[in-house]
């Protein structure tokens, strides 16, 4: 049975998709079978980061074989899968859903996940940039949530209350078993080290974990690629995400 995970925050620009991409890439390199459900239908999506041609996504939508059409009852989930490599599949909306009404119930989404979760070691859900009805769906099925933060913007607990309240509300309303693994500091530069240390101390007072491994801004590479799931990788990022995965305790 696969672990179901998400990097989630109600703030934009904290690197949710970037962290998802690098974590998935590293687990993929270790030989694990992974599914990424791409809930973000606009901007820099996981699908675009791993080198999927936009033409493939458009063709899937045209043929009514996207996650949107799975929810609409137009196709089966297996028909909507896009195989990036033999160990990595992507299930994408392929369109902008930010202005659409809720398309499926939480129970239906849970049933969909139950159909496929045993086929993978890990299922990562890449969330949309801003909270909407999709957050309830995502948090109702994931086992673990990791909250990425930008220390220069989120230097205290008050700045993180939005996503913590959202998670708490979903847990209560929909009997979600999601567990918060902790906070990971992303896009940290030399000027943010003190802010990171201060944030870590403050969150410890409230018994929230902040991972020792933070992501330096200088080591976050351009993840756009020329081919399916190839990457111009730098060794510091390679080592860094190995350490982060170890701290997440997901292997």
Label each region the model flagged.
Residues 2-42:
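Walker A/P-loop phosphate-binding motif and the immediately C-terminal alpha-helix
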Residues 33-34, 41-89:
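Phosphate-binding loop that captures ATP/GTP phosphates
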């Amino acid at each position: 049975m696969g672990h179901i995970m998400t990097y989630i925050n109600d703030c934009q620009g904290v690197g949710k998709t970037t962290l998802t991409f690098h974590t998935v890439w590293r687990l993929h390199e270790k030989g694990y079978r992974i599914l990424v459900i791409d809930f973000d239908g606009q901007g820099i999506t996981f699908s675009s980061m791993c080198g999927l041609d936009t033409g493939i996504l458009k063709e899937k939508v045209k043929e009514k074989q996207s996650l949107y059409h799975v929810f609409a009852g137009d196709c089966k989930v297996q028909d909507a899968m896009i195989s990036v490599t033999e160990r990595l599949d992507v299930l994408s909306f392929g369109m902008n859903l930010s202005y659409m009404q809720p398309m499926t119930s939480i129970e239906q989404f849970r049933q969909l996940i139950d159909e496929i979760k045993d086929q993978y070691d890990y299922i990562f859900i890449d969330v949309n940039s801003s909270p909407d009805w999709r957050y309830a769906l995502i948090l109702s099925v994931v086992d673990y949530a990791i909250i990425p933060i930008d220390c220069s913007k989120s230097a205290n607990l008050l700045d993180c209350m939005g996503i913590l309240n959202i998670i708490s509300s979903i847990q209560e309303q929909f009997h979600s078993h999601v567990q918060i693994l902790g906070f990971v500091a992303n896009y940290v530069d030399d000027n943010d080290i003190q802010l990171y240390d201060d944030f870590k101390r403050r969150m410890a007072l409230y018994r929230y974990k902040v991972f020792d491994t933070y992501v330096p801004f200088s080591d976050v590479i351009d993840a756009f690629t020329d081919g399916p799931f190839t990457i111009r990788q730098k060794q510091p990022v390679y080592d860094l995400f190995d350490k982060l995965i170890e701290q997440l305790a997901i292997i």
